[in-house]
């Protein structure tokens, strides 16, 4: 009798566990609404796959920023692009148009971090034809003449320029030092 009770108890326990472990079937609409509500309330970390890129997106991704003068910031890696034949044709046509038109303006300085040109770099470009940029530039900083080394002309000057300083200004007389010293100040000693 105790054996049959044990078997009956195990069968009942097995049925309860089996019933609770199987999920309840829901309608597809209800399930879709539940999933979209969860998706809206969650913060996702990780990669998301964007919709198919357009030809303009592909053109923008493949353009060389130093050629067109575009400025951009990119941190990390972007998703790989999937190209269709229409996108490739429009991309090739855009490149033909870019290389047929003469370049009117180049920028001698750009921003890049790291060695790869896809990243941001701070400082001057490593182009060999820097002289072309310096000759074409019409930079005049507050009336100063342009010098051979023009890097200083691109910054704001604070104080006196080294070309204006006279050697006579460094020679001070004893009287001018005494005027500025704290020893001659009567209010300071009290």
From Swiss-Prot:
RFamide 1: Expressed in corpora cardiaca (CC), corpora allata (CA), antennal lobe (AL) and gnathal ganglion (GNG) (at protein level). Expression in AL detected in most animals, in CC, CA and in GNG in some animals (at protein level). RFamide precursor-related peptide 2: Expressed in corpora cardiaca (CC), corpora allata (CA), antennal lobe (AL) and gnathal ganglion (GNG) (at protein level). Expression in AL detected in some animals, expression in CC, CA and GNG in few animals (at protein level). Residues 164-174 have a biased composition (Acidic residues). Residues 175-190 have a biased composition (Basic and acidic residues). Residues 161-190 are annotated as: Disordered. It is found in: Secreted. Residues 1-21 form the signal peptide. One of its GO terms (cellular component) is extracellular region. Residues 22-33, 69-104, 116-150, 160-190 form a propeptide. The keyword Secreted applies. GO terms for biological process: neuropeptide signaling pathway. It comes from the Eukaryota. The modification Leucine amide is found at residue 158. The modification Phenylalanine amide is found at residues 45, 113. Keywords: Amidation, Cleavage on pair of basic residues, Neuropeptide, Secreted, Signal. The keyword Secreted applies. Belongs to the FARP (FMRFamide related peptide) family. In insects, FMRFamide and related peptides have modulatory actions at skeletal neuromuscular junctions, and peptides that are immunologically related to FMRFamide are released into the circulation from neurohemal organs. This is FMRFamide-related peptides. It comes from Agrotis ipsilon (Black cutworm moth).
